[in-house]
Amino acid sequence: MNFNHEPVMIEKTIELLKPESAQVIVDGTMGGAGHSLRIINSLPPEGILVGIDQDPDAYEAGKSLLEAYGNKAKVFNDNFVNIKHICERIGIHYVDGILLDLGVSSYQLDNKDRGFTYQENAPLDMRMDKSQKITASEVVNTYSEQKLAEIIREYGEEKWAQRIAQFIVQARQDQEINTTQELVKVIKAAIPKGARKSGPHPAKRTFQALRIHVNGELDSLRTAIQEGIRLLRGKGRFVVITFHSLEDRIVKQEFKKLAQTCVCPTKLPICQCKGEATVKLLTKKPLLPSQGEIEINPRARSAKLRAVERLGSNN
């Protein structure tokens, strides 16, 4: 299995995580171990890497690459939403760094059998974790027109969402939509020809929306940030790399909330809540990949990196 996932902004990530002085760092999106290998090779002799990935293929690929490190690497086939529980299961109550790289890997995109890509014909699946019951095919063939439109509009930010949902419901009355290219055909028919002449592939936003919904990605991200912050030791760092505006908005909002001191209503002249910030923002604006990195790895183009540092002492 060639699970190729070129690690994005790896130098900036390592600089922020500071693994050389860490006891424990968690890579919540281990994948092909691109970031994990760099982290584990930078850890001190007693340092531990905890690698997590919900995709069984990604887990196996990462595990095989990290096996040589013995007990220095603890790897789990699980969702990063369970980050705190996973660490506590192995007796780790605090960590020094957490990384979430939310990009879909080249392997997942290029392996047509996974159903993530609109470039190849494949079963309409899109599950990161094959044990999940719901597939993209089930969503497309059973959800109401209104529900489909909401998903495509909210998670795909697609202005033709209502029309695409309408065309999907019409098409499935004649025959179930079970493959990626069957869905692409319906989407292309729904979007007016003039609107398809520029911009990304006409199916890109709808496929993104279905993938996010099928895998519960945004809810998992929000929960993982909240749980991960509780796990961080004082001065520990949380780095998140996102690849679309919905993810970035959630990370920005969650980090901003955690960095707030006073949460009193603005009409109060004096703070009554005595609130204290939980984190310090390390990136007031997101860091972006260099042009050189984008030329080497075009999929890095949309990446944005945000990071915070845990304040105080929780251990």
Curated annotation (Swiss-Prot):
Could you state one GO biological process linked to this protein?
A: rRNA base methylation
Q: Which GO terms describe its molecular function?
A: rRNA (cytosine-N4-)-methyltransferase activity
Coiled-coil segments, which residues?
none
| Stored Gene3D superfamilies | Putative methyltransferase TM0872, insert domain, Vaccinia Virus protein VP39
Q: Which Pfam families match?
A: Methyltransf_5 (PF01795)
Query: Under the cellular component aspect of Gene Ontology, which terms does the record hold?
Result: cytoplasm
Q: Which UniProt keywords apply?
A: Cytoplasm, Methyltransferase, rRNA processing, S-adenosyl-L-methionine, Transferase
Domain of life the protein comes from? Bacteria
- UniProt key word tRNA-binding: no
Keyword NAD attributed: no
EC id: 2.1.1.199
Catalyses: cytidine(1402) in 16S rRNA + S-adenosyl-L-methionine = N(4)-methylcytidine(1402) in 16S rRNA + S-adenosyl-L-homocysteine + H(+)
Q: Where does S-adenosyl-L-methionine bind?
A: 33-35, 53, 80, 101, 108
Record-linked PANTHER family: 12S RRNA N4-METHYLCYTIDINE METHYLTRANSFERASE (PTHR11265:SF0), S-ADENOSYL-METHYLTRANSFERASE MRAW (PTHR11265)
Q: Which family does it belong to?
A: Belongs to the methyltransferase superfamily. RsmH family.
Q: What is this protein called?
A: Ribosomal RNA small subunit methyltransferase H
Taxonomic classification: Bacteria, Bacillati, Bacillota, Clostridia, Natranaerobiales
